[in-house]
């Protein structure tokens, strides 16, 4: 009876040990040999084979989980094993992120404190590939390290956030260049994460932008030769250079606002460097980014039913200007401070002469806006300028279309009546009249105001 109690006590002890020991339990062979299977010794786990030897440098499966026995036969924990990783419990991880302290953190500038890996379904770290994880895309290099920041993969540039996720859309990034012009620039990444590199007028959310080496362009931009053609398609862009001063034209340029959008409508800005005067503001008008400009001299453009003049530099004109006409001729025009072409009577101050002048410009028809050339309301105009005699002389001759007319200081043509007669030339009969200026010159005119003779008073 005592023997039975002793056996029960041993069995009870064995059952208790089995209850508190993990599933790593082997089978005893002899009283002095190691058990086959898992054994815990001094806090470490080992696996013994049928010869009682601890297996080393190999993976061992237990149930659904894999474990690694190192060179000392100790079950590894919380470490990388080639392309695998075992957690604190020794199990090989899968479908899981793992962070590892970066050994170079203290030795390299901008080195991350931790390196991140992702272990796939087979337990291997993802390497040299993209991976979609929980709805976001990540890239892992050849060592399996999750990448951040700007990277190049298969010739395409991408940007990964601090969390490693691939970014799309607009991103403001510091420029890695010594050029003081570029401190930081805007870049755009499409819906696959690829950076837009060199493209003219890329349409993004209804607006047009141009990129050179990925940088969004602002201000004046010289189009590549192939972009000048009206193909209607997005073009390849290359870095722009200021046009030589000798060209003096904005042909081939486009303008982009500070937010990168292609300009349309009016802008008050500096002109193209090397073409317009530096540090001066001018008015420009843009259509699809291109400035209205003359091919030579000054030309007229219609904007919202109003006429404006622009030079070859694209600068809007004000004041009295000589403008090229479509037929190859030129004409005088007048533009107010807003650049709008004026018609009818205009009083204009001539800064060069330091005097106020009276002008008249056609009010309608194909010559609208052009300086009037001829006699209107008995006032004589030459290419728009009212011809006037010096007030001290009272009268002066003016040539118009091959005839000499006599005008007074108000520009009025001096005419004879049908019944008046000339004292200086009585032989002419009726329809002539004499006018004497302050120099005692006598001018004889007919009913049209055409001078018939000039004599000195006796």
Language model features by range: what are they?
Residues 2-458:
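Extracellular adhesion/carbohydrate-binding repeat motifs centered on closely spaced tryptophans
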């Amino acid at each position: 009876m005592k023997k039975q109690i002793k056996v029960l006590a041993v069995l009870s002890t064995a059952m208790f040990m089995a209850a508190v020991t993990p599933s790593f339990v082997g089978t005893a062979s002899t009283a002095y040999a190691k058990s086959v299977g898992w054994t815990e010794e001094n806090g470490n786990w080992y696996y013994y084979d049928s010869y009682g030897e601890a297996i080393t440098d190999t993976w061992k499966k237990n149930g659904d989980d894999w474990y690694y026995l190192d060179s000392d036969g100790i079950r590894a924990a919380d470490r990388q094993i080639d392309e695998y990783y075992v957690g604190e419990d020794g199990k090989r991880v899968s479908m899981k992120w793992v962070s590892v302290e970066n050994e170079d953190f203290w030795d390299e500038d901008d080195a991350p404190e931790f390196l991140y890996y992702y272990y796939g379904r087979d337990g291997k770290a993802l390497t040299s590939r993209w991976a979609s994880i929980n709805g976001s895309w990540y890239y892992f290099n050849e060592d399996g390290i999750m990448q951040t920041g700007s990277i190049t993969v298969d010739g395409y540039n991408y940007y990964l956030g601090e969390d490693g996720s691939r970014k799309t859309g607009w991103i403001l990034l510091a420029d890695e260049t010594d050029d003081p012009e570029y401190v930081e620039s805007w870049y755009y990444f499409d819906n696959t994460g690829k950076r837009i590199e060199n493209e003219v007028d890329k349409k993004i959310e209804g607006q047009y932008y141009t990129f050179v080496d990925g940088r969004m362009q602002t201000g004046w931009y010289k189009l590549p030769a192939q972009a000048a053609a009206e193909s209607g398609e997005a073009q390849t862009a290359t870095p722009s250079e200021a046009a030589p001063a000798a060209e003096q034209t904005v042909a081939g340029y486009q303008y982009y606002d500070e937010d990168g959008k292609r300009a349309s409508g009016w802008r008050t800005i500096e002109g193209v460097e090397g073409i317009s005067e530096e540090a001066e503001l001018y008015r420009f008008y843009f259509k699809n980014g291109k400035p209205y400009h003359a091919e030579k001299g000054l030309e007229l453009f219609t904007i919202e039913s109003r006429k404006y003049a622009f030079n070859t530099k694209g600068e809007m004109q004000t004041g009295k200007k000589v403008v090229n006409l479509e037929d190859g001729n030129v004409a005088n025009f007048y533009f107010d401070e807003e650049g709008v072409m004026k018609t009818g009577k205009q009083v204009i101050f001539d800064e060069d002469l330091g005097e106020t002048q009276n002008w008249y410009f056609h009010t309608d028809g194909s010559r609208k806006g052009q300086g009037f050339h001829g006699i209107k309301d008995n006032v004589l105009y030459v290419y728009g300028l009212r011809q006037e005699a010096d007030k001290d002389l009272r009268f002066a001759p003016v040539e118009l279309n091959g005839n000499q007319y006599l005008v007074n200081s108000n520009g009025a043509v001096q005419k004879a009546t049908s019944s008046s007669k000339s004292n200086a030339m009585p032989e002419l009969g009726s329809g002539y009249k004499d006018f004497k200026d302050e120099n005692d010159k006598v001018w004889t005119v007919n009913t049209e105001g055409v001078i018939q003779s000039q004599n000195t008073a006796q």
